[in-house]
Amino acid sequence: MRVAGSLVDVDSGRKVEVLTTMPGMQVYMANWVDGEFPHLQHNGVALECQHYPDSPNHPEFPTTVLYPNQTYDERIVFRFLYVCFVFSYKQVN
């Protein structure tokens, strides 16, 4: 598995890493919601591991065809972490 993506909240130190055996990931944001409570605009994100869109029509992409007696085996792990950030800055006059 490999780390396909991660999200970090630098204020709280919360972090989620998404590890997967899949070749691709779609990222969706809550940009389409109308802003009514409890679904505020931009307050959501989805990380969806998957194969590449339109894979059957692109022979250069990993195959999504499953033949008889083959086993489909993919894995996704959401790892939740706490990270500590140390910020320093130099004031420029």
List each language-model region with its residue ranges.
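Active-site pocket scaffolds in enzymes
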Residues: M1-F85, Y89, N93
